[in-house]
């Protein structure tokens, strides 16, 4: 009987580090729910000590997720571990993941310490984490460049201290697959208590072999793989979990292991991460790219028509990618829209039916026919904007001709007040943004503007993703409409609402801090 490989997802921690703007707590929760639906065993959802916002999002996810183990990262520092436990304690069960560097380079130049001191610190911090939970994971940062004898000493000590999972990261993506497999085999040969822990691997894609390294490690005995959906992450990214999962499934003949992932949810989860993180998936991306199951060669097309297995080692259906079909029109009622969402596997709690149906009717009136991908875009891109809005786009118009100069008029609801402004700009989008900024008075610098089509043909929805800089912080916004200028305006309004909410959160934190200080003085 094959053994299980635990899937540890770090999209919301290591993956998020690649984004130009941090995700909101609600966006993180949306991704966490998608990962839970896909069946990941463990999800690492943040680094609570890093900021109040990260603490809040970890706490929210820990309170909500029931079918996956929620994990938070902590350095081998007392405060890190204590704060992680504080954020996670609302969960029925949780994991603390603590780490320290073990390579000679990191020990000498970063930690300015010795291997013996590193081992002593690791043991102390694993024991401290065990005071909060019996599920403690310990990582040897830069294990790929750590001599295996040194690594074995650290691993043995961490297991004796109570770590149930030992993670071996190729932190800088330096190791070759045969080398990495050798490290795992070497640990099994050298560590006498290794049977008391699960060996995990965490690989990076700097040389394009993160997935290869993870699979080689599994073949050598690792039983947990860490990675991120779509391979997002620092520098060149993390190990792409969807690739590892499907490689294990397709090549079960030689891997002789399995995962508990619902692989029919892979495509939808990948799309959710792509849309929320504003990271388009390359067409030639393995497993989830738009061209992953496309056949253009005449010879290949002929072979596939005769027998799909001639050129397909897996099917689109195996990852949940079914043939896109016509579903709904403006004459469809709420029940029909709800039924189609149920057919696609969504529950009532996954989206707001009132918002979805209103948006559906507007879109159906414009384009006549609404497809599955339209519904998902309306449900889950617009969902990010369902929180109470201080700013709302009431009206806009743009005049432009053959010259570069355009004029925009905008009405914006600011709380209970409607304000209007007009402005010129270098094109219609710039004019809209100038007018909006005049109304709000916010000093924002546009640092990224992306336009992507959601759907097919001339009636496709246009999704605009923007990132702005505001007083040293970056904020992300998204807008969706059949008109690009309208999408752009909605994206900017979304950004401004995110800035406004961040300011309100800061005010609330200051108020709580002041109340705490006042209570101290009273005592």
Curated annotation (Swiss-Prot):
Mn(2+) binds at residues 14, 202, 204, 238. Keywords: Amino-acid biosynthesis, Branched-chain amino acid biosynthesis, Cytoplasm, Leucine biosynthesis, Manganese, Metal-binding, Transferase. Its main location: cytoplasm. Coiled coil: none annotated. GO terms for biological process: L-leucine biosynthetic process. Residues 5-267 form the Pyruvate carboxyltransferase domain. Its cofactor is Mn(2+). Present in a monomer-homotetramer equilibrium. This is 2-isopropylmalate synthase. It comes from Salmonella typhimurium (strain LT2 / SGSC1412 / ATCC 700720).
């Amino acid at each position: 009987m094959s053994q299980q490989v635990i899937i540890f997802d770090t999209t919301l921690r290591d993956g998020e580090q690649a984004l130009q703007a941090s995700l909101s707590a609600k966006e993180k929760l949306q991704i966490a729910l998608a990962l839970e639906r896909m069946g990941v065993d463990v999800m690492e959802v943040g680094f609570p000590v890093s900021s109040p916002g990260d603490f809040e999002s970890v706490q929210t996810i820990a309170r909500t997720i029931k079918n996956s183990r929620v994990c938070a990262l902590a350095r081998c520092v007392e405060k890190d571990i204590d704060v992680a436990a504080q954020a996670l304690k609302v969960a029925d069960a949780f994991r603390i993941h603590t780490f320290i560097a073990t390579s000679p380079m990191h020990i000498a130049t970063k930690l300015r310490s010795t291997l013996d001191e590193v081992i002593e610190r690791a043991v102390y911090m694993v024991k401290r984490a065990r005071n909060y939970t019996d599920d403690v994971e310990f990582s040897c940062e830069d294990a790929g460049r750590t001599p295996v004898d040194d690594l074995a000493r650290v691993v043995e000590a961490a297991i004796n201290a109570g770590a149930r999972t030992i993670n071996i990261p190729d932190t800088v993506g330096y190791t070759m697959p045969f080398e990495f497999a050798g490290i795992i085999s070497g640990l099994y040969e050298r560590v006498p208590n290794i049977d008391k822990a699960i060996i995990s691997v965490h690989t990076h894609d700097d040389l394009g072999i993160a997935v290869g390294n993870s699979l080689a490690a599994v073949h050598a005995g690792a039983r947990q793989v860490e990675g991120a959906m779509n391979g997002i992450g620092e520098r060149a990214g993390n190990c792409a979990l969807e690739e590892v999962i499907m490689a294990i499934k397709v090549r079960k003949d030689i891997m002789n292991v399995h995962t508990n992932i619902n692989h029919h949810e892979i495509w939808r989860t990948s799309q959710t991460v792509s849309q929320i993180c504003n990271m388009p998936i390359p067409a030639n991306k393995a497993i989830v790219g738009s061209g992953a199951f496309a056949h253009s060669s005449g010879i290949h097309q002929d072979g596939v028509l005769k027998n799909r297995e001639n050129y397909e080692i897996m099917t689109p259906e195996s990852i949940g990618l079914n043939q896109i079909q016509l579903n709904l029109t403006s004459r469809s009622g709420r029940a029909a829209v709800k039924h189609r969402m149920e057919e696609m596997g969504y529950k009532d709690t996954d989206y707001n039916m009132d918002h979805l149906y209103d948006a559906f009717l507007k879109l159906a009136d414009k384009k006549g026919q609404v497809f599955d991908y339209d519904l998902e875009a309306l449900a889950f891109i617009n969902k990010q904007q369902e929180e109470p809005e201080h700013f709302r786009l009431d009206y806009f118009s743009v005049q432009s001709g053959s010259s570069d100069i355009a004029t925009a008029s905008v009405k914006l609801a600011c709380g209970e007040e409607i304000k209007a402004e007009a402005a010129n700009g270098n094109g219609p989008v710039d004019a809209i943004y100038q007018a909006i900024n005049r109304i709000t008075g916010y000093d924002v610098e546009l640092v990224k503007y992306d336009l992507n089509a959601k759907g097919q043909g001339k009636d496709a929805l246009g999704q605009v993703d923007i990132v702005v800089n505001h007083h040293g912080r970056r904020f992300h916004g998204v807008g969706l409409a059949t008109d690009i200028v309208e999408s752009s305006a909605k994206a900017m309004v979304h950004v401004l609402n995110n800035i406004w909410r961040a300011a309100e959160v800061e005010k609330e934190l200051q108020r709580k801090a002041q109340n705490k200080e006042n209570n101290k003085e009273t005592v």
